[in-house]
Amino acid sequence: ILEAQTEENISFVLTDTAETCEKYPFHFALHIGYELCKNEVKVNWTVENTDTKELYFSIGAHPAFNCPVHGEENKTGYGLKFGGLADTIHHHGNTPDGMAVMEDKVLALKDGCVTFTEGFFDECTYMVEGKQTGEVSLLDREGIPYVTVKFDTPLFAVWSPEGKNAPFVCIEPWYGRCDATR
């Protein structure tokens, strides 16, 4: 439901209903706001507990960004820059059915950057926990950032569908993730 709107801002609210309570038995109000500020879009989530019992939830964004952007056939040579990092980032992957695999893996970086090679996304998803960075940029083949996602979440994921040469990369800030295999 539209909550408020100005020329630069818009906000929506989702509240629990009898139908939502069938699958998610909690009373809540989810407020999502968008603000245009020069060449940025700022997104704000507020999860409000409208009950007296504890509210369990996870929330995350699912933005996808065009890649490649200059008419190339694939993403090879494009890349990512992880703000504030230099040599490595720790991550883990997931199973084909979406379960997290908690085996610690290290992605080598050069000056905080990694370049996409053929098969880079064959692991499907790079899940990064522990607030290792709060900024991820997509880089074109010249190493120039063309989109940057800034966030203050405990984890994020970067992925593109494996083996499909999909024309996008997702950079997803998350509060919570899928369950893990053991």
Please provide the spans of the model-predicted regions.
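Extended, loop-rich substrate-binding clefts of extracytoplasmic carbohydrate-active enzymes
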Residues: I1-K38
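Hydrophobic residues positioned within well-ordered beta-strands of beta-sheet architectures
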Residues: I10-F12, L30-I32, V43, I59, ...
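Surface-exposed, gly/pro-biased binding rims or lids
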Residues: A18-E19, L85-I89, G98-A100, V169-R182
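Short glycine/proline-enriched turns and hinge-like loops at secondary-structure junctions
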Residues: Y24-H27, F57-I59, E162
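Short, well-ordered beta-strand segments enriched in hydrophobic/aromatic residues
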Residues: Y34, V41-N49
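Active-site scaffold segments
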Residues: K42-N44, H62-A64, F168-W174
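Active-site/ligand-binding surface loops and adjacent short beta/alpha elements
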Residues: E54-Y56, A64-F151
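Active-site pocket scaffolds in enzymes
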Residues: P145-R182
